[in-house]
Amino acid sequence: MSKPVIEESAEYDNYMDDQKRKEDSYSVGLDKFLDGEVKPVLYDQTKKKKKSDAWKVLYVHFKERDDMVEFCQLINQMIPYNIKETWYPLHHPDARLFGFDDEDPITVDPSLLKPRDKDYGDTTLDVDVNVVTRDDVKWRQYWLDMPEYVQENNEHFRTVHIKFRKKEHFEEFSKRIGQDMTEKTKAIWHPELKVTKNRLLRWVEDGERTLPRHPLYIISKTRYDSMFTSRSLARMQIPHHIVIEPQEEQQYEEALDNFGIRDYVTLLVAPFSNHGDGPGRARNWAWDHSISIGATWHWVFDDNISDFYRLNRNQRIRFESGAGFRAMEDFVERFENVYIAGPQYRFFCAPDQKYPAFVANTRIYSALLIRNDCKHRWRGRYNEDTDLCLRVLKDGDCTVQFNAFLQGKAATQSVSGGNTAEFYHAENSDKISEEGWNAEGTVNKSQMLVDMHPDVTRLVWRYNRWHHWVDYEPFKKNKLKYKPGVNPENKENNYGMRLETNFNG
C-alpha cells in the first residue's frame, strides 16, 4: 500500500455554481449578453419515449445477396431494398383463418434485393462520432514509423430488422431459419456465422515486453468486485496505479489477491471520499501525483475497460503487451500542440469498414494520455472528458483519437458501481412516460455540457434517452505541428508485435 502525501493543487470545480458558469471564458452563453440568468431550455423536451409495439426486434445481417435470397425463401417474405424492417409473421395471425401454414410460397426476385444506399445518418444528430473523417486521407502523411495499418471497406450486403409480436413467433422463426436463439439474442448472421478464429488471435511480443513510458492511473470506485481495467493491464504485465477512496481500501486490498494482480498494482488512497462530483476530482489528483514523480505525461483510465485491441486488416485483435500504448505515446510526442490522446471505443470501429488510423481534434474518452503541462484541469460533475477536450481545442491545440488502437469499454451504466450508483440514473422510469424525460437521468449530465459549451453543443433525444451532440467541425482547422527537428522515417514499425494464431495465455 502506498499512501503518498499529495495535496490537491486546486479546489475542484464541479461547475454547479451559477456565478462560476457566468465567468467561464470558454462558454459563450447568452447570459453574458443579457441581464439576468438565462435558464437552459431542453431541446425537444416534450418528445415522449416511443414504446415499441414489438415483443422483440432481431437484427439479421447478410454477407451476400444469395444469403438474403435463401432467407426470404425460408421465411416466405420478399424484403426489397426499400424495406428496412418487417414483421414475422408478416400479417397478424389473429387476422388469418389459418396459422403459419396458410401461406403460398413466394417467388424471390434477386434484383429487388439490392443493398440500401449507404447512409451515415443525420450528422446534426451525431453523438460524438465524427463520421466525416472516415475517408480522410491526410492521416497517412503523419502515420510514419508506426505499426502497419490497412483498413478497407468490406461491408456486409444488408441488414434487416425482424419484429416479433410474441415469443411463439420468435420460436417459429428460429426453427424456420435453422438457428438456435434465446430471448437475449440481439443480432444474427444468415447463414449462421462461425466466429471462432479471433478467440485464438493475439498481438504478442517475444522476449522482453515493451512497457508504456508514462505512468498509468485507474480511477475506481466500488468496483473491487470487477476491476476490469486493472486485470487487463496486469495480464499484459504493465505496472499501474489505482486511485481509490479511503473507505474502500480494505476491499481493494483483498481484490488484488483475489484476482492475482498485486504484483502489478499500486493502490493510491485519495485524500477525499463520497464527494458526489464524479471522477474528475480523482483524475486531477492522479495528475498531481504524476507530476510529483517527475512524469511529463500520464495515462488515466476508467475502471470498466476489459481489453485493448489493435485494428488492422479488418480485424480487431487484442494486444497482450504494452507495445500499443508505447506506439500511441511515441506518435503524440512528435507534436508540439497535442495535449490529449487515446484509443477509440471498440464498438465504434466495425471491422468491415474503412477508418483512418487516427482522427485529430475530437473528444477522447475513458482512456486518456494527457500532457502534464496542459493548462486545463478536469472540472464538472458530468462529461468531464468532453469538456476538457473542448477547452484544449478552443485554444487552437489538438487532440488525437486512435482507431489503430481500441479499448473494449463497457457500455455506459452497464457495470454496477463507479459513478453509476452515485448520480447516473436509469432512463426507464415512469417520469419518461409522463413527462418525456427523467429529470434525474442522463439529461442532467448532457445539459451540463450544453451549459459549458453552448456554441458547439446541444441536447438531443436518441436511443430512448438524452444525449449531447457536439459539433467538432470548427476545430478541423487546428493543424498538427511537429516539434522542431522531428522528421519520422517513412517506414513500418510494428514495435515487436507478432500475431499469435493459437494463443492460450
Question: At which residue positions do the language-model features occur?
Answer:
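A solvent-exposed, charged loop/short amphipathic helix patch at secondary-structure junctions
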Residues: 305-323, 415-432
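Short, aromatic/basic amphipathic alpha-helical patches
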Residues: 72-77, 174-179, 229-234, 251-261, ...
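Conserved catalytic core of nucleotide-sugar-dependent glycosyltransferases
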Residues: 308-391
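Active-site-proximal specificity loops/subdomain of glycosyltransferases
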Residues: 244-301, 306-320
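Short, well-formed alpha-helical segments that are part of the catalytic scaffolds
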Residues: 212-238, 244, 248-256
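Compositionally biased, non-globular sequence tracts
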Residues: 2-207
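C-terminal catalytic/acceptor-binding lobe
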Residues: 207-215, 221-225, 380, 386-505
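A structural signal for short, well-ordered beta-strand segments and their strand-loop junctions
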Residues: 242, 297-301, 339-344, 399-403, ...
